């Protein structure tokens, strides 16, 4: 809350060196809205992601990596920074204080804290390969590597069949997002 000046004073009092403190923000690694993600069944249990994740198949969405959309993250956010829109959690970047409660609560680990200054991020967490992704979600990363080949700065790599953007290398040119056939790479500003 107090930023770098307060961190510096606290470090001075404690006799340690202050690290850098870049503002963070929650980011939902799923674009699998009701319009684009297939369902395996209709879930009628308790409206809680943690409970739904205990059901065989980890919720009603056919993608076992995606946002369950039942709002457990919304419930724990004391700042009103999260909402469920069309079956997927959405973050209000201006309200998020990066407390990490949503990250800790999400049973599918779909929410991460990323630097507020990140230019682009990949809105998918599936580790499945292309064809398997397309069978369950029209907006999932298919691991085609076009984004990797477009990046002149080496900021985009493929890890576990999914594009990963290194914010320390990303120059914000947007070529990766332009080339992505699934439009799963999004500008954050």
Predicted regions located by residue number:
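Ferredoxin-type iron-sulfur electron-transfer modules and their immediate structural context
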Residues: 1-150, 154, 177-179, 183-189
């Amino acid at each position: 809350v107090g930023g770098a000046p307060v961190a510096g004073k606290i470090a001075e009092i404690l006799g340690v060196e202050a690290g850098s403190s870049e503002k963070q923000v929650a980011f939902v690694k799923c674009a699998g809205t009701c319009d684009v993600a297939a369902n395996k069944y209709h879930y009628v249990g308790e409206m809680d992601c943690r409970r739904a994740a205990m059901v065989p198949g980890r919720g009603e969405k056919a993608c076992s990596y995606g946002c369950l959309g039942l709002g457990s993250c919304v419930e724990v956010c004391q700042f009103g920074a999260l909402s469920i829109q069309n079956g997927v959690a959405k973050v209000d970047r201006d309200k998020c204080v990066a407390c990490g409660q949503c990250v800790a609560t999400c049973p599918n680990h779909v929410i991460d804290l990323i630097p507020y200054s990140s230019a682009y991020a990949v809105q998918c967490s599936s580790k499945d390969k292309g064809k398997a992704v397309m069978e369950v979600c029209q907006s999932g990363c298919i691991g085609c590597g076009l984004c990797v080949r477009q990046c002149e700065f080496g900021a985009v790599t493929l890890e576990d069949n999914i594009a990963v953007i290194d914010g320390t290398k990303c120059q914000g040119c947007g070529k990766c997002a332009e080339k992505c056939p699934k439009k799963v790479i999004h500008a954050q500003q």
